[in-house]
Amino acid sequence: NNRNGIAITWNKIEGATGYYIYRDGKKICQVKKETTKYTDKGANKNGTLYGFSIMAYKTINGKTYKSVISPGVKSCFLKGSSIDILTKKAGNTHVSWRKNSKANGYQVQYSTKQSFKKARVKTVKGQNKKSAKLSKLKNTKSYYVRLRGYVRKGKKKYYSHWSTCAKIIPWNGKWEFAGYSKIHTDSAVLYFSSASKVKNKTVCINAGHGTKGGESVKTLCHPDGSAKVTGGSTAQGAIRATSINGGTTLNDGTPEAKATLNLAMIVKQKLLKAGYNVLMVREDEDAQIDNIGRTVYANNCADYHIALHYDSTSSNKGAFYIGVPDNQSYKNMYPVSKNWKKHNKLGKNLVWGMENAGVKIYGKGEMAIDLTQTSYSTIPSVDLEVGDKSSNHSNKALKTIASGIVKGMNK
């Protein structure tokens, strides 16, 4: 099995002009002698068993001579599954996937090497299974994870192709600014795109808030210990801020953290489909990584950092990005000094993309605030306020916002 159908290979026959390929007794293809492999893209019905055979032929003076047909070989096409969510929290690692209705079970493979050398394998039996707990993963090591489904036909087991892998990335205390983070016991996860044209760029998607206990811990607003130059969730002049706050509550009672997570999961899938790799720093209700921790992860494992939020107003004013304040002392502070123009450019592109996708934009699409995120960012980084407490956050609305974010990234 591969993504497009069933791949067939055979031994080369010396002197042959070419080969005929048969599926279920019917000739489907004629290939030339240089080829000893072929992918039957027509053998792509999920859960269907196909039979294949090969016949060599030789053409001499316009006349074709055929060999006897090879013994038949059977193979079942099984559509591949993909990893949906992978989390590693306080020693517990869980993986979930989108189930295949024709699969009888799944294999999950995980290894410290991307080649999956010396990999561990967990077999999950059951047609309706779509998650598994992985064991014996060390907290200080990175792990690559992939999966495939299987189906039984008689006494034989057939497998789908392997999914694109995801990588668990543990916290590294040697990273720049790592010492400023107070909460970082969970791991981030890097998802690799399986698009036909990958962009070789990684976007960190940060679903704002969602860290239990974060409000009881304080961190420095700036890495140099200076005071905030504007107000915001933390007052102007403050030296320390909440490591990560709980967020607001939308007018229908939905916690902001839940709304941003719903959006983040949609953005993740759309970016992967568009060819971007995606770093996720929160994929569930509680991710034990604070604002500085999420920023440090993005700095070291991504090319761009987009944090998703809803503003605390109730006027349905529209979306905007948080720009860098026009304060010279702040702009001169490292790492802001090297990146503030990149932050603002990313924000403008994202607002442009959302506006072109049909998202309501607030004013000129920018509000300047001194944020912890941009104060520690060494890559293009932006807080994107996608609406406020009165904004529509239905699945349809979130898909529109996500499409706009992809448009902005592609600009």
Predicted regions and their residues:
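Short beta-strand segments within Ig-like beta-sandwich modules, predominantly Fibronectin type-III
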Residues: 28-35, 122-128
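Short coil/turn motifs at secondary-structure junctions
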Residues: 15, 26, 59, 102, ...
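Conserved hydrophobic/aromatic "anchor" residues
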Residues: 10, 19, 50-52, 57, ...
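Extracellular low-complexity, O-glycosylation-prone stalks/linkers
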Residues: 13-28, 102-123
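Beta-strand-rich modules
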Residues: 38-65, 134-157
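Short, surface-exposed beta-strand/beta-hairpin micro-motifs centered on an aromatic residue
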Residues: 7, 35-39, 94, 129-133
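Pro/Thr/Ser/Gly-rich low-complexity, intrinsically disordered linker/stalk tracts
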Residues: 1-15, 46, 62-102, 139, ...
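Catalytic-site microenvironment of enzymes
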Residues: 90, 169-411
